[in-house]
């Protein structure tokens, strides 16, 4: 099995979402109740107040305030007099992210109890858990549901295809509704009209786990670690150059360098933060920047879903970026022209920069195509992809100059940025083979 099939866990500071996992492989129902105790019963307003007090944010990438999601569903229920639905987004379709899989495999009741807490507060009668094809994670979640009668009556597991865009909220809602599981052509709010056209509270699996921790600890204890404006701990998925890839739980405010050090992960030319819709930081900045949304934003980064991918030494940075640009172009749902046409144009331009055939003209094409795509898609995929590529062009200036003016940087493309298995990434993987020495 791959070492990330059952992710290793590391901690800096107190264990919260990873509590008990230092002594148990998987936390069953009895152990979960022993470690976390009973969840308090809370009203929707109490839950909103707690989430607001600690500024609880979504853990899936966008970082949307959880209290605002809750309030939007409460308002929609009052307006329509329809019962709400709760959806746990555990698809985790992005390569490099495995924090949700870790919780599903090893602490499934933390996710499920958080979802049940929200469902009770909202008076929802049904919870959907959206998953993809990780059999170990799916078996663990299904076994956890089967072992608890209250969950058996409440929770249904729904499997999405293994694609990058499967976790987009609109794509997940469409999938559950029996439609093609791609982002809708027109942006819609799940809180207004989601599963079965009912008001739907949809959030990431780790967000529900955080909600359970918040309910157990209460806002004051929850906020006793981390920075005051963004308290608590977060889960980071660290791989790339890491000799010890792991899910790391740490308080906000901890320097990213401390996380890289415990994972034995040299930064090399740079570190990608926030996954393939994230941004690059140079090594010096990466080691000093504090973990958290505000700290990373102040340094030009983005927290996203907590993915940390250091490049390490000895690989071609732009070659790595080009592989991923090709993969992301192939993951488009193909329904928006800027995405369907623009992302392949960016990928081709990046490939010709790296192989030395494109020069300054290819660089101009990449930048123009990115500008043409940005802000024009129905979902976040084109914007995220252009952000990833343009950030690389800003951070890897020395490598860019070597390729544009001298055709090569002389380093191989080692494949430090992960790609999923399967035919849809064959072209991107072939690039790595073709550029044995770029």
Regions found by a protein language model. Name each.
Residues 231-244, 250, 256, 418-438:
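C-terminal accessory/binding modules appended to enzymatic or scaffolding proteins
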Residues 121-128, 241-244, 331-332:
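Short, surface-exposed connector motifs at secondary-structure boundaries
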Residues 62, 67-70, 97-100, 139-144, ...:
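Short acidic, glycine/serine/threonine-rich loops at helix termini
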Residues 112-118, 251-267:
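Short amphipathic, charge-patterned alpha-helical segments
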Residues 1, 82, 133-252, 263-266:
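Hydrophobic alpha-helical positions that pack around
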Residues 69, 125-127, 264-276:
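Short loop-to-beta-strand transition segments
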Residues 1, 35-50, 77, 82-84, ...:
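Ferredoxin-type iron-sulfur electron-transfer modules in oxidoreductases and energy-metabolism complexes
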Residues 1-180, 434-436:
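Iron-sulfur-cluster electron-transfer modules
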């Amino acid at each position: 099995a791959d070492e990330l099939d059952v992710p290793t866990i590391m901690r800096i500071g107190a264990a919260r979402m990873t509590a008990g996992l230092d002594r148990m492989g998987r936390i069953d129902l009895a152990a979960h109740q022993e470690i976390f105790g009973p969840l308090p019963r809370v009203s929707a307003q109490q839950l909103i107040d707690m989430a607001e007090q600690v500024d609880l944010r979504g853990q899936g990438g966008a970082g949307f305030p959880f209290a605002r999601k809750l309030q939007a569903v409460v308002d929609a229920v009052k307006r329509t007099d329809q019962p709400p639905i709760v959806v746990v987004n555990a698809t985790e379709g992005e390569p490099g992210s495995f924090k949700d899989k870790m919780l599903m495999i090893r602490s499934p009741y933390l996710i499920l109890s958080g979802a049940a807490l929200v469902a009770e507060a909202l008076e929802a009668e049904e919870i959907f858990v959206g998953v993809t094809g990780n059999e170990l994670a799916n078996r663990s979640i299904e076994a956890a549901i089967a072992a608890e009668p209250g969950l058996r009556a409440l929770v249904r597991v729904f499997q999405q295809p293994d694609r990058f865009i499967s976790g987009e909220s609109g794509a997940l809602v469409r999938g559950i509704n029996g439609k093609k599981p791609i982002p809708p052509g027109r942006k819609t709010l799940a809180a207004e009209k989601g599963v079965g056209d009912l008001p739907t509270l949809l959030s990431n699996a780790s967000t529900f786990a955080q909600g359970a921790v918040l309910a157990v600890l209460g806002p004051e204890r929850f906020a006793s670690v981390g920075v005051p404006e963004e308290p608590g701990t977060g889960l980071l998925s660290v791989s790339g150059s890491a000799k010890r890839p792991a899910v790391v739980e740490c308080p906000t405010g901890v320097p990213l360098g401390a996380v890289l050090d415990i994972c034995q992960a040299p930064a090399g030319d740079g570190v990608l933060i926030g996954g393939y819709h994230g941004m690059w930081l140079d090594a010096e900045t990466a080691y000093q920047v504090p973990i958290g949304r505000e700290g990373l934003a102040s340094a030009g980064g983005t927290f996203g879903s907590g993915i940390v991918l250091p490049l390490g030494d000895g690989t071609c940075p732009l070659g790595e970026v080009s592989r991923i640009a090709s993969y992301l172009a192939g993951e488009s749902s193909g329904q928006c022209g800027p995405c369907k046409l623009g992302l392949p144009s960016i990928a081709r331009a990046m490939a010709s920069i790296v192989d030395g055939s494109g020069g300054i003209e290819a660089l101009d094409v990449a930048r123009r195509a990115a500008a043409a795509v940005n802000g024009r898609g129905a979902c976040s995929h084109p914007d995220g992809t252009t952000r990833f590529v343009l950030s690389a062009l800003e951070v890897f200036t020395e490598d860019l100059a070597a390729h544009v003016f001298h055709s090569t940087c002389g380093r191989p493309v080692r494949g430090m940025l992960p790609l999923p298995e399967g035919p849809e990434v064959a072209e991107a993987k072939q690039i790595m083979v073709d550029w044995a020495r770029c």
